[in-house]
C-alpha cells in the first residue's frame, strides 16, 4: 500500500501489569519478549521496503525511562530503528511530577535532545501541549498532547472536538491524532467486549482529519480488513500528502465546523478536508 513504516507495540518485557503503577522499574527497553524476533522482523520489513517504528511505553514512569534512555536508543540504532513513539499513560512517577510539570517538560526536551544525538525521530504521546519546540528540535516530529482517536473507544470525544483543536492544541505544533478508523461499531473489536458502543465519527470525517489535523507524520489506525472493505476511501489515505507548500483555512466556526485546503509540497495537488 506504499506505507512508509509500521508501528509495533507490546514487543518488550513489562506489559504483564503495566497499569498497576506500583513499580519503580516497569519496562525494559532493550529486552524483547522471546517470541519477538527483532532482527528477523527488520530483515522482512527491509525486504518489503518498510521501516519498523519503535514503541516506548513508559507507564508514566519517566524516571525509569531516563535511566534506560541511552541504552534504549543504542538498542534502536543497533537493530535498525530510526523512529520512536513514546507513551506516558497513567499517573507520573516519581510521585507529584505531573504531565505538565516543569520536571516533565524538562524530561520531554531531554528525550528529544538525546534522540537527536542518535539520529532518532520522536513522536510523543500523553505529553504536554507543545509550544513550538518542534522547530528547535526538528526530530521531534509530532505529539499527541490532546484527546486523539483512541478516546473514541473510551467513551468518545465530543462531536465538536476536532473543530476546536485547530484553534487550541494545534497552535503549538503538529498533532498525531491517529485518524483512519473505518469501523465505527466498537463491538467489532476485542471480541465484542464493547457491545452496543459506537464511535462518534463517520468515514468522511475520518478522511477529513488527514487535512484538518496537521502532522508530517500520519497514521492509518484501523485493521487492514476494514480498509479492504472501503478501497476507494482507503485510496485517499494512500494519496493524501503529509508535507505541504500551502495551507488555507477556508471557513471555520470553532465548535461547529472547519474547512481546510492544503497543497502538497512540490505539486499543484490540493486536498480539502
Question: Locations of the language-model features?
Answer:
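Aromatic- and carboxylate-enriched substrate-binding clefts and catalytic-loop regions
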Residues: 10-198
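An acidic-aromatic substrate-binding cleft motif
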Residues: 1, 5, 9
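Carbohydrate-binding surface patches
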Residues: 254-273
Amino acid at each position: 500500500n506504499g506505507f512508509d513504516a509500521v508501528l509495533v507495540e507490546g514487543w518488550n518485557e513489562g506489559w504483564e501489569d503495566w497499569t498497576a503503577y506500583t513499580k519503580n522499574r516497569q519496562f525494559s527497553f532493550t529486552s524483547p519478549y522471546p517470541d519477538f524476533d527483532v532482527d528477523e522482523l527488520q530483515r522482512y520489513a527491509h525486504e518489503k521496503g518498510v521501516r519498523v517504528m519503535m514503541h516506548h511505553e513508559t507507564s508514566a514512569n519517566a524516571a525509569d525511562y531516563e535511566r534506560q534512555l541511552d541504552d534504549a536508543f543504542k538498542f534502536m540504532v543497533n537493530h535498525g530503528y530510526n523512529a520512536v513513539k513514546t507513551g506516558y499513560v497513567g499517573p507520573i512517577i516519581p510521585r507529584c511530577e505531573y504531565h505538565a510539570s516543569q520536571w516533565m517538560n524538562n524530561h520531554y526536551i531531554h528525550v528529544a535532545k538525546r534522540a537527536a544525538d542518535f539520529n532518532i525521530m520522536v513522536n510523543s504521546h500523553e505529553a504536554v501541549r507543545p509550544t513550538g519546540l518542534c522547530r528547535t528540535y526538528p526530530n521531534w516530529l509530532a505529539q499527541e498532547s490532546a484527546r486523539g482517536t483512541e478516546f473514541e473507544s473510551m467513551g468518545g470525544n465530543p462531536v465538536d472536538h476536532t473543530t476546536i483543536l485547530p484553534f487550541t492544541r494545534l497552535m503549538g505544533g503538529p498533532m498525531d491524532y491517529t485518524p483512519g478508523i473505518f469501523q465505527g461499531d466498537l463491538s467489532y473489536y476485542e471480541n465484542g467486549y464493547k457491545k452496543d458502543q459506537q464511535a462518534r465519527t463517520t468515514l468522511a470525517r475520518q478522511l477529513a482529519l488527514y487535512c484538518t489535523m496537521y502532522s508530517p507524520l500520519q497514521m492509518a489506525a484501523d485493521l487492514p480488513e476494514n480498509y479492504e472493505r472501503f478501497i476507494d476511501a482507503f485510496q485517499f489515505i494512500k494519496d493524501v500528502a503529509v508535507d505541504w507548500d500551502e495551507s488555507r483555512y477556508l471557513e471555520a466556526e470553532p465548535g461547529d465546523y472547519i474547512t481546510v485546503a492544503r497543497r502538497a509540497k512540490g505539486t499543484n495537488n490540493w486536498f480539502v478536508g
